[in-house]
Amino acid sequence: VPNYSEVLPKEASLETRLTKRIRLKIPLVSAAMDTVTEAETAISLAREGGIGIIHKNMSIEEQARQVMKVKKSETKIIENPVTIAPDATLREAKDVMARHNISGLPVVIGDRKLVGIVTDRDLRFETDLEKPVREVMTKEVVTGRALTTYDEAVAILRKHKIEKLPIVDENGRLVALLTFKDIQKEFNYPSAAKDERGRLLVGAAVGVGKGAIERASALVEASVDVLVVDTAHGNSKAVLDTVRAVKEKFKDCQVIAGNVATGDGAKALIEAGADGIKVGVGPGSICTTRVVTGVGVPQITALLDCCKVARQWDCPVCADGGIKYSGDIVKALACGAETVMVGNLLAGTDEAPGEVVFYQGRTYKVYRGMGSIQAMRAGSKDRYFQDEAASDKLVPEGVEGRVPYKGPLSKVVFQLMGGVRSGMGYLGARTIKELPEKARFVRITPAGLKESHVHDVQITEEPPNYNVP
């Protein structure tokens, strides 16, 4: 219901909490689904101010590599940069650059003593790739000292018109590297969600049971910011035991657990040590849990119940599922959630890992539930507590389908957050924290829902933030 307001949409702040310790610039989390979130989605969403949760339908090593890819995509100062020896060949240098997706390498000897730098420009016109790096590297290198501040380092880059500044200690040993590319990213993405070292935030999913701790250990080693104990039924012994075990072993790591749909479930997860809880049993567009099992709670009811309990422990809630329009995000936040997790809305973007398909002249991307037969066979059986079941004995709780292609993720996020800001303006809420205080819900009938949508007109041009239900 609209309120008296003195808040313009552009004045609304979207900053919020993901967990007790992690803050985001926007309340958007991408789902840990194998057709939604891998490194590319996580990088793009973190640059917009949200966070991506890398799915676990892959090996432990690959998931850790995906996390590292996000963490290394940008940083204020690169600590322990990748290096090469002067006797290495140009072929080896090119291979290292390609493997790490970088454009230059400091050249070091012995105990990381800096003797030069080689970049892709040095290699561009070289035809003899067996030539040693020492023959083409730049030997007179401009450097910064270990005590050089970030602003001083940026000034050195500008003064000497260089793109890379190695940072060395008093003995000339390489300790860090600053690049113009990372500085440029900071200007291009001022609202990016980053850790204290200037790296993008990223989360990763873990399951329950035997492999959970091993997977969590590898992810923590890869510098993951938050672990998500990701199951369909969070209020169960296996999940609660896993949360306790993860928190006990990795005390400094933030843990989100779910999914639950009742206050009792939320309380159990919080008491087990969760730093954030995920709410939603069956509201997702590709989820069939409520129909197959007969169990679930309508999402608004579940959120109101769980948020009431979570508020007593000051534990953030993430509303997972049921988000079709930006207005649904506003409703979830008005219930007391501090973030929303979306899958369908991002599955059609360029960055999503789903396969591109063409159907009847239109472009789509594959989108499947983690409870679909195909996803369960690929590794998500334990999410539905069927990890011991044979592939031909699985009981699915989701479907595989397709969603319209949507282009870059940034455009989708812009429209979603624009809708949220407008909703906050209607309610007179300057911050997300104020939304539950300002919001008042009314129950509508099917006739009211029909009236809410476009009616009595044929759409001739589709807007970027609305599609006919």
Model-predicted segments: where are they?
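Catalytic cores of alpha/beta
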Residues: 40-42, 214-222, 261-279, 319, ...
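Bateman/CBS regulatory modules and CBS-like beta-alpha motifs in cytosolic regions of diverse proteins
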Residues: 8, 12-24, 31-33, 62-100, ...
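Active-site-adjacent beta->alpha loops and helix N-cap segments on the catalytic face
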Residues: 8-10, 59-68, 126, 130, ...
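Catalytic beta/alpha-barrel core
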Residues: 54-57, 83, 104-106, 143-145, ...
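Terminal amphipathic helices with adjacent charged low-complexity linkers/tails
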Residues: 56-70, 107, 111-126, 167-184, ...
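Alpha/beta catalytic cores of nucleotide-metabolism and tRNA/nucleoside-modifying enzymes
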Residues: 1-5, 84-85, 144-145, 155, ...
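Glycine-rich phosphate-binding active-site loops on the catalytic face of alpha/beta enzymes
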Residues: 47-62, 224-236, 275-293, 323-357
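Short beta-strand/loop segments at the ligand-binding rim of alpha/beta enzyme cores
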Residues: 23-30, 77-81, 196-205, 246-261, ...
